[in-house]
Design a protein with these regions (language model features):
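Active-site microenvironments that recognize anionic phosphate/pyrophosphate groups
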Residues: 1-214
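A short, hydrophobic C-terminal helix/tail in secreted or cell-surface proteins
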Residues: 216-218
């Protein structure tokens, strides 16, 4: 498909998944055009439904490589850039927190279900990779234990490994799970987190951040 078609498809995905309100269709389109360095856009007449996120992101990434927007065509750099793409669709942290709190008043289950779905819809939890994991349950005296073999994390390519070794070491964010990761653009030796949202919670008078793991665990 053409670039314009893929932009329309992605924005439609955002609307269908609830990430983007209809009122922000044009705004989101323009955010994507800026990201790709495009100044012109002709909205396709075709209407899209049930958009496959993995497919449209792959095509947009290929376009970014062809245009020179994405300098290296490897999984590390593609992951960094597709996270930047998704950031154009993801609600701001305050909006996510507000929705979570409102749903929590109705039911903690509703709130956590909303947050889990959001983490997948934003591509923070990559559904198409998680499917590769092997999972099974083992009974124990404490209840069933979930065991998994993580096959969803792709292997880094040699160029990315070499670049990571040469990259300047940074103390920011302090770790992979710290609050400072929320919205962080990432670098070759630290994953992008622009599509990540953290829910502040208080436990025994201490402030914590509730978040989902990329591997679907709760942290």
């Amino acid at each position: 498909m053409t670039f314009d078609e893929n932009v329309k498809r992605l924005v439609q995905y955002g609307i269908e998944s609830g990430l983007v309100p209809e009122e922000e269709r044009i705004y989101t389109t323009n955010q994507l055009l800026e990201l790709f360095g495009e100044e012109e856009y002709t909205e396709p007449e075709t209407e899209f439904k049930d958009v496959d996120l993995e497919e449209v992101l792959e095509e947009l990434l290929d376009y970014a490589v062809e245009k020179g927007v994405l300098k290296e065509n490897s999984v590390v750099y593609r992951d960094l850039f597709d996270t930047k793409i998704m950031n154009c669709l993801v609600p701001r942290p305050a909006q996510v927190i507000g929705t979570f709190k409102e749903l929590y008043k109705e039911s903690p289950v509703k709130a956590t279900d909303y947050y889990y779905k959001l983490s997948q819809d934003t591509n923070y939890i990559r559904r198409y990779r998680i499917k590769k994991d092997i999972r099974w349950k083992v009974p124990s005296q404490y209840g069933d234990i979930d065991i998994s073999i993580n096959l969803s994390k792709p292997e880094k390519d040699p160029k990315a490994i070499a670049a990571a070794k040469l990259a300047k070491q940074s103390g920011y964010p302090k770790c992979l799970l710290c609050r400072q990761n929320e919205g962080y653009a990432g670098r070759v030796n630290h994953p992008a987190r622009q599509n990540h949202r953290i829910i502040p919670i208080t436990v025994n008078g201490t402030q914590w951040g509730f978040q989902r793991s990329e591997e679907r665990r709760v942290g």
